């Protein structure tokens, strides 16, 4: 393959206009690891260069090759994403510590992913993290070639995404008065807790992830795990409240009232704004851990069951079929918006 490549201050990460941003990222990675400041260029070079390209012929669009000799480092992807993953592998080969030069051993790497969907999940509803921390999380995902970020944005313990049509979701639903200590010990820390992301925050984070070839899949959990939303809009619950943003862990009986037409409008409105913020093909609607206790004694829910002819059988109760009714409603709305539901 040849001898090692010496990266020093006159070595340029080089990419065409499409890959210029990746060249800049690589220069930043090298600076972070070693303190060595490199300039980037879009001009072709024959030596003393880390050349990025995306012309590799391969059946897998995320494939890449790395070749290192004494004059050049070549990173070639089957697409811009493939080149990006090659950059991440090169990044992991960098030494750490202040250096005037970096030696990259002569080598050849041919790599491609086994799985096209490589995902990670972050729950910011129960434990909020700042927008900067989310970006740091995305950086870590990029380092490990993760290309899907499942973002759990709402739950009983907090609503974290700004919905302009329902401002109380963040004014009230984003903050709980206190948090239980341990696993429902009955003791509380007495400290208010919360936070949320503005729609501008969301757009910036979505763009930041896309630059790293990561698709964010947002999750709005329904019809259970909605007590934070009910604290803001109690009329959406079976009892009308009052509710509070939940201070415990586990599963609460406070769920959306499916017999209330306002609930269906609420779901449509929220999903409209979510779809406008996230270009992902998939939108996650949760659907898990929804107790049917309130529905069994809610006149509106029982009326909906009767009106929709949702009958129990040997496998499902009428209330379980009521949940399916709501999920189908959400799915049909997302399909009309050109998206696919998961959950």
List where the protein language model places each region.
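Contiguous, structured surface segment used for ligand recognition
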Residues: 3, 8-117
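Active-site beta-loop-alpha junctions enriched in small/polar residues
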Residues: 125, 154-158, 221-225, 288-292
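Active-site mouth loops of central-metabolism enzymes
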Residues: 119-133, 255-262
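An active-site-proximal structural segment forming one wall of the substrate-binding cleft
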Residues: 144-149, 202-223, 254-286
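A conserved hydrophobic secondary-structure block that centers on an alpha-helix together
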Residues: 123-156
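Gly/Pro-rich turn-and-neighbor structural signature
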Residues: 264, 268, 272, 276-343
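Conserved, mostly hydrophobic/aromatic
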Residues: 30, 79, 120, 141, ...
């Amino acid at each position: 393959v040849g001898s090692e490549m010496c990266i020093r201050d006159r070595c340029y990460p080089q990419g065409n206009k499409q890959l210029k941003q990746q060249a800049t990222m690589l220069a930043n990675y090298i600076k972070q690891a070693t303190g060595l400041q490199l300039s980037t260029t879009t001009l072709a070079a024959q030596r003393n260069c880390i050349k990025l390209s995306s012309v590799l012929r391969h059946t897998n669009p995320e494939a890449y090759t790395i070749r290192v000799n004494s004059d050049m480092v070549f990173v070639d992807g089957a697409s811009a994403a493939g080149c990006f993953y090659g950059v991440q592998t090169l990044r992991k080969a960098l030494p750490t510590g202040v250096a005037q030069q970096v030696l990259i051993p002569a080598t050849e790497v041919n790599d491609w992913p086994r799985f096209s969907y490589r995902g990670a999940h972050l729950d910011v509803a129960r434990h909020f993290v700042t927008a900067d921390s989310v970006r740091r999380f995305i950086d870590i995902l990029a380092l490990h070639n993760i290309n899907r970020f499942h973002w759990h944005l709402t739950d009983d313990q907090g609503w974290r995404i700004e919905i302009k049509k329902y401002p109380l979701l963040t004014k009230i639903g984003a903050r709980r008065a206190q948090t239980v200590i341990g696993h429902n010990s009955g003791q509380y820390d007495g400290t208010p807790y919360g936070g949320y992301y503005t729609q501008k925050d969301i757009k910036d984070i979505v763009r930041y992830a896309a630059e790293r070839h990561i698709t964010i899949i947002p999750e709005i959990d329904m019809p259970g795990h909605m007590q934070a939303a009910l604290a803001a809009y109690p009329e959406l619950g079976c009892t009308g409240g009052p509710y509070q943003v939940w201070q415990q862990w586990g599963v609460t009986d406070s769920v959306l009232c499916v017999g209330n037409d306002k609930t269906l409008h609420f779901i449509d409105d929220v999903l409209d704004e979510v779809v406008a913020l996230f270009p992902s093909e998939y939108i996650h609607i949760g659907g898990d851990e929804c107790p049917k206790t309130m529905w069994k004694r809610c006149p509106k829910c029982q009326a909906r069951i009767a009106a929709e002819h949702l009958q129990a059988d040997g496998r499902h109760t009428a209330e379980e079929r009521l949940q399916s009714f709501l999920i189908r409603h959400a799915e049909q709305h997302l399909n009309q918006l050109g998206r696919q539901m998961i959950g």
